């Protein structure tokens, strides 16, 4: 066990020889509420998820791991590929005794959630993809970097020191190589194999995830739907947590959409 952030507590779990840090909510959720696992984006670790974790904690048990190599988790000498990060996420979920959960990813975390739903469907009840990357129409480092620069103008200032600190902690080599792995991941090919209810959430001001790409993601998911949060940037998990929590609660309380062929 470890330090606390108001309403959240730290824990470390050994997975594949690595100590994995996670934050979890300390409130007792309503009986029967599904656990939600928050999967962070590129480099920023679970610290970026704290506002959303606090917003969801009264209704659900929240778990927010730092993927190996990021945040307070142990850093392996090699940079893990997306498939390896996904395997670690699955192993961590089992090690925590979570038989089945809702997985909510942000940005590159969405790519891991999609991989998990395809490779380990027994663990996944529903998925929420908030700002899913990488748009195949802009799958180069130059294009994505320009989109990230544009997005930084719309993000709340409190995210900047968190992001810079976490980027420094994970190191430039790990950050750039993970970025490269994400660029090489054809998420669009995996989406039709996600066989659980799926919610895609986009901020209307998000230049990283265009409206066209968000619609394509939802259309490719057999049980997918799209919600757009007005004037929201890319990182809704940090900058619009109350609005995002509201649409997540609505999604989880609604009956599953009928599966369609895609």
Predicted regions and their residues:
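Conserved HGGG/HGGXW glycine-rich cap/lid loop of the alpha/beta-hydrolase fold
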Residues: 18, 23-72
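Conserved acidic catalytic loop of the alpha/beta-hydrolase fold
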Residues: 83-101
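Conserved hydrolase catalytic core segment
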Residues: 99-138
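Hydrophobic, aromatic-rich cap/lid helix
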Residues: 160-189
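Short beta-strand/loop motif that positions the catalytic acidic residue
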Residues: 193-194, 200-202, 206
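Conserved alpha/beta-hydrolase "acid-adjacent" motif
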Residues: 207-213
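Catalytic histidine neighborhood in serine/cysteine hydrolases
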Residues: 218-235
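Catalytic histidine-centered segment of alpha/beta-hydrolase-like enzymes
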Residues: 232-245
């Amino acid at each position: 066990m470890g330090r606390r952030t108001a309403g959240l507590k730290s824990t470390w779990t050994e997975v594949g020889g690595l100590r994995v840090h996670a934050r979890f909510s300390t409130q007792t959720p309503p009986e029967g509420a599904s656990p939600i696992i928050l999967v962070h984006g590129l480099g920023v670790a679970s610290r970026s998820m704290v506002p959303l974790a606090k917003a969801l904690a009264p209704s659900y048990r929240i778990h927010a791991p730092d993927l190996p190599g990021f945040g307070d988790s142990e850093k392996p000498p090699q940079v893990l590929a997306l498939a390896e990060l996904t395997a670690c996420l699955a192993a961590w979920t089992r090690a925590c005794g979570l038989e089945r959960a809702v997985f909510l990813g942000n940005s590159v975390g969405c790519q891991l959630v999609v991989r998990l739903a395809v490779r380990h469907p027994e663990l996944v009840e529903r998925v929420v993809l908030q700002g899913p990357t990488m748009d195949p129409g802009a799958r180069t480092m130059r294009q994505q970097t320009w989109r990230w620069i544009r997005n930084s103008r719309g993000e709340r200032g409190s995210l900047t020191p968190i992001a810079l600190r976490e980027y420094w902690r994970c190191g430039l080599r790990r950050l750039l190589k993970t970025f490269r792995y994400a660029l090489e991941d054809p998420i669009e090919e995996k989406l039709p194999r996600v066989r659980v209810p799926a919610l895609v959430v986009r901020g209307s001001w998000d230049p990283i995830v265009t409206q066209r790409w968000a619609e394509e993601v939802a259309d490719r998911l057999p049980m997918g739907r799209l919600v757009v949060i007005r004037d929201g940037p890319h990182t809704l998990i940090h900058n619009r947590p109350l609005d995002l929590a509201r649409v997540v609660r609505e999604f989880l309380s609604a009956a599953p959409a009928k599966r369609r062929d895609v």
